[in-house]
Amino acid sequence: MLSRSAIRSASRSVVAANLVRSMNRVARPALVVAGRRFASAKAQPTEVSSILEERIRGVSEESNLNETGRVLAVGDGIARVFGLNNVQAEELVEFSSGVKGMALNLEPGQVGIVLFGSDRLVKEGEVVKRTGKIVDVGVGPELLGRVVDALGNPIDGKGPINASGRSRAQVKAPGILPRRSVHEPVQTGLKSVDALVPIGRGQRELIIGDRQTGKTAVALDTILNQKRWNNGTDESKKLYCVYVAVGQKRSTVAQLVQTLEQHDALKYSIIVAATASEAAPLQYIAPFTAAAIGEWFRDNGRHALIIYDDLSKQAVAYRQLSLLLRRPPGREAYPGDVFYLHSRLLERAAKMSEKNGGGSLTALPVIETQGGDVSAYIPTNVISITDGQIFLEAELFYKGIRPAINVGLSVSRVGSAAQVKALKQVAGSLKLFLAQYREVAAFAQFGSDLDASTKQTLARGERLTQLLKQNQYSPLAAEEQVPLIYAGVNGYLDNIDISRIAEFETKFLAYLKANHDEIVSAIREKGELSKELLATLKSATESFVATF
């Protein structure tokens, strides 16, 4: 007879054998499938990187991986490079194919580089070397009248530019002590801007609105209006203009250059173009390049105006770069530092103190909204950074009110201190009249029985709105704006038919220049109206209206 222990061990071996058989029935097919999958599976990108790293290590032990590197992967304007251990953030690097790039991501084991050119020319395994330079551009008066790309290279076919100096594209903005408050005017030549939303030298004034509402037209008219001072010899009155086109069509940029040439305004302007067909890194760096060019004038005691058209496209380009470099996305998929991107750019606009040369750089950034939504991420960011905004509305544009500036939503936080005194004297109540008109007009459409004062408010508001209309490429000097606004605010247009307001403007200005030139010349030279001149202007306006 078998002992109890022998029976127990025999039963255990039987159970174990059955368990092995059942496991084999389940596990063998799974192992076979897994084996087949493993045989047919593609290597992951990280595995490819590690394989390439091992191979590079094998052949490049003697070469110095601190100063050079090799391309692991390239695509979408981004190159991932193994090596370059000593590379600095935002350093310029050069590929053996001749393409240049900027080190934007410094990661353990590899460097993320954005390419300033076509990624088709860059091949896997290609050698990359440090240049020891941060991205810099040529600066100086030699750039005036030229069109350059995002890296400062000429693209207008007029030959090379022998710039007198070079400056880094990204530098720290001036501190608090070297600055002084805004106190000198930047005259745009637009009645609705100069009278209601005045801009000063060193200010940042945002131009915001939907597509095709005339944002670029406002900026372009401002450039054209500087011709009257830039043709003179007084350097303190000149305002040099830098226009940067980000993500725009090449045809649009060509048309803009042609317009400036036709109006003899290109000679005091510099165009920086990073068009829609350019790589995202170039659209990202172009505004910084333009800021460096404008800063040369600011730091040499001169005055410059810079127009960023537009920063929403720069933000989109930066979002593309950040996502491709696998930086964590935030609101609307923009990276967390997109606010810093725009703040460090716009803070470079400043009015310097006399001790620091007294120069200035004025910024007019442009932001395109979608469906009038100013509460989106980028518009709210830039509104909070700037010193005010000019808000353009599609609804006003389609009504024929051009420039389509919404006077109620537009504001200038620091410009009133810089406004031409004569304009401030006559335009003080203009904003109030227009606000009352908008309020009354909203209710007037519901009822026909209106009292006399309401009818007068409506009549004056309609005429003031008509008076603020202006044709493109026809900016007005302050001495021309003051008499017109004076006539409108003081009710001299109330009995003139709306269809004849434009005719009144032309004939009234001609009448003043012919018969009362002392008013025009006093505003031009002194910028303000004395009591005697105000009385003369009043009698001149009354006598002209009586015969009109």
Swiss-Prot record:
Kindly state which keywords UniProt assigns to this record, in alphabetical order: ATP synthesis, ATP-binding, CF(1), Hydrogen ion transport, Ion transport, Membrane, Mitochondrion, Mitochondrion inner membrane, Nucleotide-binding, Transit peptide, Transport
SUPFAM superfamilies attached to this UniProt entry: C-terminal domain of alpha and beta subunits of F1 ATP synthase, N-terminal domain of alpha and beta subunits of F1 ATP synthase, P-loop containing nucleoside triphosphate hydrolases
Query: Which InterPro entries does this one have?
Result: ATP_synth_asu-like_sf (IPR023366), ATP_synth_asu_C (IPR000793), ATP_synth_asu_C_sf (IPR038376), ATP_synth_F1_a_nt-bd_dom (IPR033732), ATP_synth_F1_asu (IPR005294), ATPase_a/bsu_AS (IPR020003), ATPase_F1/V1/A1_a/bsu_N (IPR004100), ATPase_F1/V1/A1_a/bsu_N_sf (IPR036121)
Protein residues bound to ATP: G209, D210, R211, Q212, T213, G214, K215, T216
Compartment(s) of residence: Mitochondrion; Mitochondrion inner membrane
One GO CC annotation: mitochondrial inner membrane
The main location is: mitochondrion
Xref: PROSITE patterns: ATPASE_ALPHA_BETA (PS00152)
Recorded GO molecular functions are: ADP binding; ATP binding; proton-transporting ATP synthase activity, rotational mechanism
Subunit details: F-type ATPases have 2 components, CF(1) - the catalytic core - and CF(0) - the membrane proton channel. CF(1) has five subunits: alpha(3), beta(3), gamma(1), delta(1), epsilon(1). CF(0) has three main subunits: a, b and c.
Q: What does this protein do?
A: Mitochondrial membrane ATP synthase (F(1)F(0) ATP synthase or Complex V) produces ATP from ADP in the presence of a proton gradient across the membrane which is generated by electron transport complexes of the respiratory chain. F-type ATPases consist of two structural domains, F(1) - containing the extramembraneous catalytic core, and F(0) - containing the membrane proton channel, linked together by a central stalk and a peripheral stalk. During catalysis, ATP synthesis in the catalytic domain of F(1) is coupled via a rotary mechanism of the central stalk subunits to proton translocation.
> What name appears for this protein in its UniProt entry?
ATP synthase subunit alpha, mitochondrial
Organism per entry: Kluyveromyces lactis (strain ATCC 8585 / CBS 2359 / DSM 70799 / NBRC 1267 / NRRL Y-1140 / WM37) (Yeast)
